[in-house]
Amino acid sequence: MKRSGILNAELGEALATLGHTDLLLVVDAGFPVPRDAHRIDLALAENLPDLRTVLGLIADELVVEGVVRAEDVPSHNPRLDSWLHERFSGAEFTTRPHAEVLGELAREAKAVVRTGAFEPWGNIGLYCGVDAPRWFGGEGVVVPEQYASKV
């Protein structure tokens, strides 16, 4: 039996397949997941599991270099936005119109993880990165400019 971390087999498998720049969407209970998306449905009941728990567990296992959320999040759900900035402090943050998060980003995502969250604008995209110190830390390796501050 696995000792810790994410125990859900489907989610664990999806995380293991993600590569640099791949997008993972972690969404609330009401998100309209596209029919052809790789849907990982964790929702059991209202706020079970909640968005922050799922994002936190994923963050413990995944290198995240970018976070995208609806442009409404900073003004309409500032507590969530603040939490995201704390939890993903090394990531670049961007916003998109809410309709794009529901449409274009959902189609772009390698997987969509549905939580039980009843969280306004609780649909968060995570762009995968690389562990820069481990990736570029070898002797004689020239570190690309965009990773220099992370090595």
Curated annotation (Swiss-Prot):
Query: In this UniProt entry, which cysteines form S-S bonds?
Result: none
Annotated Gene Ontology cellular component terms: cytosol
Isomerase in keyword set: yes
Active site (catalytic residues): H20
Its taxonomic placement starts with:
Bacteria, Bacillati, Actinomycetota, Actinomycetes, Kitasatosporales
Q: Where does this protein chiefly localize?
A: cytoplasm
The pathway to which it is assigned is: Carbohydrate metabolism; D-ribose degradation; D-ribose 5-phosphate from beta-D-ribopyranose: step 1/2
Q: Which domain of life is it from?
A: Bacteria
In short, the EC number is 5.4.99.62
Query: What's the protein here called?
Result: D-ribose pyranase 1
Q: Where in the cell is it found?
A: Cytoplasm
Which purpose does this protein serve, as stated in its record? Catalyzes the interconversion of beta-pyran and beta-furan forms of D-ribose.
Q: Which residues bind substrate?
A: D28, H98, W121, G122, N123
Q: Which UniProt keywords apply?
A: Carbohydrate metabolism, Cytoplasm, Isomerase
Cite a single GO BP annotation.
Answer: D-ribose catabolic process
- InterPro entries on file: D-ribose_pyranase (IPR023064), RbsD-like_sf (IPR023750), RbsD_FucU (IPR007721)
Catalyses: beta-D-ribopyranose = beta-D-ribofuranose
| Entry's family note | Belongs to the RbsD / FucU family. RbsD subfamily.
| Keyword 4Fe-4S tagged | no
The record describes its quaternary structure and partners as: Homodecamer.
The molecular function terms of the Gene Ontology recorded here are: D-ribose pyranase activity; intramolecular lyase activity; monosaccharide binding
Annotated HAMAP family: D_rib_pyranase
